[in-house]
């Protein structure tokens, strides 16, 4: 077992367990998108970035292994700035028609937008530019989605 501190809260956690799981299991929310309990952690969404005392820079909490004595911060101005930028970059390539999406109302991306609150409009949305194929009466093939 290892004793780690996340935002001033001491936790007894299994050594080498990823910090994101440790936090979530103890009621500490760290924003994340690409994490799934049945898959190996990637850190590709960059939402779960944290600062570790004694280490330079930031690291993704889903790939960070818990070590005894580790002190972790999840809420700093720099982390908020980095998360907002990562979310804005994700949204530049995301369709804006959420109300027609099957995940509408139960979408992790929408929840992150509400939690982080990006300043939309700073980055221009990339349009993919594909014309929907409507030659089949039953299937709409839209490569823009």
Ranges and model annotations:
Residues 4, 31, 71-72:
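Short small-residue beta-strand/loop micro-motif enriched in glycine and branched aliphatics
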Residues 5, 24, 114:
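Short polybasic/polar patches that bind polyanions
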Residues 11-68, 82:
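N-terminal cofactor/phosphate-binding cores enriched in small/glycine residues
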């Amino acid at each position: 077992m290892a004793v780690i501190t996340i935002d001033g809260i001491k936790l007894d956690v299994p050594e080498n367990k990823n910090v994101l799981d440790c936090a979530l299991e103890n009621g500490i929310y760290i924003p994340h998108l690409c994490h799934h309990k049945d898959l190996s952690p990637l850190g590709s969404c960059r939402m779960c970035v944290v600062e570790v005392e004694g280490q330079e820079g930031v690291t993704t909490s889903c790939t960070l292994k818990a070590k005894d004595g580790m002190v972790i911060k999840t809420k700093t101005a720099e982390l908020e700035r980095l998360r907002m930028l990562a979310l804005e970059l994700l949204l530049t390539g995301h369709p804006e028609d959420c109300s027609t999406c099957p995940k509408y109302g139960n979408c992790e991306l929408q929840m992150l937008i509400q939690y982080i609150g990006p300043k939309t409009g700073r980055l221009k949305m990339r349009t993919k530019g594909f014309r929907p194929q409507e030659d089949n009466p039953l299937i709409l093939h839209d490569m823009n989605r």
